[in-house]
Amino acid sequence: WIMGHMVNAVPQIDQFVNLGSNALEMDVTFNKDAMPVYTYHGTPCDCLRDCLRWEHFPVFLQELRKATSPGDAKYHEKLVLLLFDLKTGKINNNQANTAGQNVAKQLLQHYWNYGNNGGRAYVILSIPYVEHYELIRGFRETLKKEGHENLMEKVGYDFSGRHKLDTVREAYKKAGVDGHVWQSDGITNCLPLVDDLPRVREAVRNRDSPDGFINKVYYWTVDKVATTKKALGAGVDGVMTNHPDVIVNVLNESGYNDKYRLATYDDNPWETFRN
């Protein structure tokens, strides 16, 4: 999976997919009532990027729906995964459940269209704090209550903070999650390349072990050829990037093109491939 990073304005959807992304990451900002209101990152962000691009969350979801609905004029067949980076830093722990309910309602209305010819992409809810595990509960309970429990098949989860993996496992247990787990790790592209992969390798070991809880591992932010090769060498399933074309070129190189291919809609993002 080549995950286009910080796609928060509508024109960036086409831009990143045309450069080679089959997955997109959006930053979702909440107001004080735990309502998701904007796709927006803000400063600081990755080097050489405009941190201030934004859109109203419902509008952005509607555009994502068009981009992932077969038959729509804006449809991109290869766009198969959407990762919502939920910026929950401003909400407290006892609002997390409400935040999850609100995200579910917005997705249900504006992306899934209440199950009536909605967007078909898989969705990952990425949460920065394990303390906010109730967000997952609120999300799942809302889909159930609204009669769309079947859509949970389309949803996966990621705790994106740098927590110990045991702590992450515990949070999933509390959230009632078993499976559909992506684990991320990374470092901003502004910092010189340090070997930041020990935690990635630990996550890959967990994924590859019979009693692991992780299904997929991705690394961010991968913008250079050397970093791409390092991440692939560590065994990741996906990379998040500001430059999808760089990753595409590496995957087309000999030595890589016989080992890797871009994920399509037929590839289940919750299925584990062990090294």
UniProtKB/Swiss-Prot annotation:
Catalytic residues as annotated in Swiss-Prot or TrEMBL: H5, H41
**UniProt remark on cofactor binding:** Binds 1 Mg(2+) ion per subunit.
Query: What Gene3D superfamilies does this protein's entry cite?
Result: Phosphatidylinositol (PI) phosphodiesterase
Cite the entry's keywords alphabetically: Cytolysis, Dermonecrotic toxin, Disulfide bond, Glycoprotein, Hemolysis, Lipid degradation, Lipid metabolism, Lyase, Magnesium, Metal-binding, Secreted, Toxin
Q: Where in the cell is the protein located?
A: Secreted
GO BP: killing of cells of another organism; lipid catabolic process
This protein is called Dermonecrotic toxin LarSicTox-alphaIII1
Query: InterPro entries, per this entry?
Result: PLC-like_Pdiesterase_TIM-brl
Obligatory cofactor(s): Mg(2+)
The record lists its disulfide bonds as C45-C51, C47-C190
Which EC numbers characterise this protein's activity in its record?
A: 4.6.1.-
Q: Where does Mg(2+) bind?
A: E25, D27, D85
